[in-house]
UniProtKB/Swiss-Prot annotation:
Highest classification ranks of the organism: Eukaryota, Metazoa, Chordata, Craniata, Vertebrata
Pfam families reported in the protein's UniProt record: WD40
Subcellular location as annotated: Cytoplasm, Cytoskeleton; Nucleus
MF annotations from Gene Ontology: actin filament binding
Function statement: Component of the Arp2/3 complex, a multiprotein complex that mediates actin polymerization upon stimulation by nucleation-promoting factor (NPF). The Arp2/3 complex mediates the formation of branched actin networks in the cytoplasm, providing the force for cell motility. In addition to its role in the cytoplasmic cytoskeleton, the Arp2/3 complex also promotes actin polymerization in the nucleus, thereby regulating gene transcription and repair of damaged DNA.
Protein name (database record): Actin-related protein 2/3 complex subunit 1B-B
UniProt keywords, alphabetically: Actin-binding, Cytoplasm, Cytoskeleton, Nucleus, Repeat, WD repeat
Organism: Xenopus laevis (African clawed frog)
Name of the gene: arpc1b-b
Length: 369
């Protein structure tokens, strides 16, 4: 595991470029910083300044090398690299509340933005007018959309919101794509069609994620539960009440294994058994180091004041690499089918890259199916 602390400020969201040599993240501000790995060091090479409010979502398209950002200023920007300078293009989302999350579609011909306006903006480029336009998915969303994830077919879109529901919508836009083929989630997919809706849980849905095949969707909510809906099993929903603090993010690393993290400051493995229809705890993925007894330097004392609002040396040291809540997980290599590396960022301003093989060798009881 490689841990790097960029700043004292929390990292609210991040995205990687195609070859994982550059990372773009928001340090809890109006700006986006882009760092490049130079040997073992990270060097800031760009700073994207255009938003008037805090940046809440970032996604980096691997093939077109475009970055999309959204923020509390109710706008989205598509950034294009020209002559080593990132140029922004404003996208009017037609919303009256903050944008909360953004995701490029797999084919990168459209992107989705979730917002506090109780809707999802599906944005695509209109060649005739040379402009980004959007269509809205509204019903039956009743509260802020907190998370999004695309199905591999480029049409179905998973959304989690603070009305305690996770849903799957069709985002088919005939202007930019061909009619989609039937999927286990359904065959009729006009724009805005509700393909799946979970029953009410007891908490905001913080994160949603499709599996590599697209036949399963997982989500985590604020009542410390993790759930999977399996389209090949008649939309069967399997849930597990965890003994952790609420989870904030989740991703598939194989078709049957998931990694989730949140307020406990370390990632956790969960395993799905398709035959039995059960979810089980697979293990904690953070190997604690033996702490050494020593005094605190002045620098560490001020860092504790800034990160944890305390300078007390007693009972404040966490065994985990992250020292505050983990806000996002992203797959770095191998994809969701067979992930070999994944990344976590947190409110401690740190970024950690986890090697799956190293985790399996370090944790003897760990079994990733």
């Amino acid at each position: 595991m490689a841990f790097h602390s960029f700043l004292l400020e929390p990292i609210t969201c991040h995205a990687w470029n195609k070859d994982a040599t550059q990372i773009a993240f928001c340090p809890n501000s109006h700006d986006v910083h882009i760092y490049k790995k130079d040997g073992v060091k990270w060097t800031k090479i760009h700073e994207l300044k255009e938003h008037n409010g805090q940046v809440t979502g970032i996604d980096w398209a691997p093939e077109s090398n475009r970055i999309v950002t959204c923020g509390t200023d109710r706008n989205a920007y598509v950034w294009t690299l020209r002559n080593n300078v990132w140029k922004p293009t404003l996208v009017i989302l037609r919303i009256n509340r903050a944008a909360r999350c953004v995701k490029w579609s797999p084919k990168e011909n459209k992107f989705a933005v979730g917002s506090g306006s109780r809707l999802i903006s599906i944005c695509y480029f209109e060649q005739e007018n040379d402009w980004w336009v959007c269509k809205h998915i509204k019903k039956p969303i009743r509260s802020t959309v907190l998370s999004l994830d695309w199905h591999p077919n480029n049409v179905l879109l998973a959304a989690g919101s603070s009305d305690f529901k996770s849903r799957i919508f069709s985002s088919y836009i005939k202007e930019v794509e061909e009619r989609p083929a039937p999927t286990p989630w359904g065959s009729k997919m006009p724009f805005g069609e509700l393909m799946f809706e979970s029953s009410s849980s007891c908490g905001w849905v913080h994160s949603v994620c499709f599996s590599n095949s697209g036949d399963r969707m997982a989500w985590v909510s604020h009542d410390s539960t993790i759930c999977i809906a399996d389209a090949t099993k008649k939309m069967r929903v399997t849930s597990l009440i965890t003994d952790t603090l609420p989870l904030l993010c989740v991703t598939f690393i194989t078709e049957n294994s998931l990694v989730a993290a949140g307020h406990d400051c370390y990632p956790v493995l969960y395993t799905y058994d398709e035959a039995q229809g059960t979810l089980s705890f697979g293990g904690k993925l953070d190997v604690p180091k033996q702490s050494s007894q020593r005094g605190m330097t002045a620098r560490e004392r001020f860092q504790n004041l800034d990160k944890k609002a305390s300078s007390d040396t007693n009972n404040i040291t966490l065994d985990s690499l992250h020292k505050n809540s983990i806000s996002q997980i992203s797959v770095l290599s191998g994809g969701k089918a067979k992930c070999s590396k994944f990344c976590t960022t947190g409110l401690d301003g740190g970024m950690c890259i986890w090697d799956v093989k190293s985790l399996e060798s370090a944790l003897k009881d760990l079994k990733i199916k």
